[in-house]
């Protein structure tokens, strides 16, 4: 679970087995992700990003905010690394035509996870 404090997110240990939002579910023990009860195959780092976004749905985060929350503030990593992992997440979510989840880009700022309405499909 993540809590927003003064514009920053803070990781708090999630004791629940599953975190769910709309069609998306992550298993906090096995570190697996599911959309419409179908497992999506993603890397461990993409899983951490998905976990962060899932705990903050419909919230846009800057690339720097995602880096700080997922990698830690002491890591010097380029913004392109985030873009690569977001591309991986997009492809994984698009693989299943039944999955209504979408990674949205906030141009020149960052990303969020959203639920696509039936009209958007």
Show where each model-derived region lies.
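Basic, amphipathic DNA-recognition helix from helix-turn-helix-like DNA-binding domains
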Residues: 1-22
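Generic hydrophobic-segment detector
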Residues: 12-13, 21, 27-28, 62, ...
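N-terminal hydrophobic or amphipathic segments with adjacent small-residue motifs
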Residues: 17, 25, 31, 66, ...
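A structural micro-motif at secondary-structure boundaries
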Residues: 20-47, 112-121
């Amino acid at each position: 679970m993540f809590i927003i404090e003064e514009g920053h997110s803070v990781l708090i240990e999630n004791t629940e087995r599953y975190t769910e939002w709309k069609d998306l579910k992550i298993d906090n023990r096995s570190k697996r992700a599911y959309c419409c009860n179908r497992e999506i195959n993603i890397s461990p780092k993409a899983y951490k990003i998905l976990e962060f976004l899932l705990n903050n749905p419909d919230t846009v985060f800057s690339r720097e905010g995602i880096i700080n929350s997922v990698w830690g503030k002491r890591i010097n990593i380029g913004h392109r690394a985030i873009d690569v992992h977001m591309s991986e997440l997009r492809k994984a979510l698009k693989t299943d035509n039944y999955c209504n989840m979408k990674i949205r880009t906030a141009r020149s700022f960052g990303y969020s996870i959203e639920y696509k309405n039936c009209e958007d499909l």
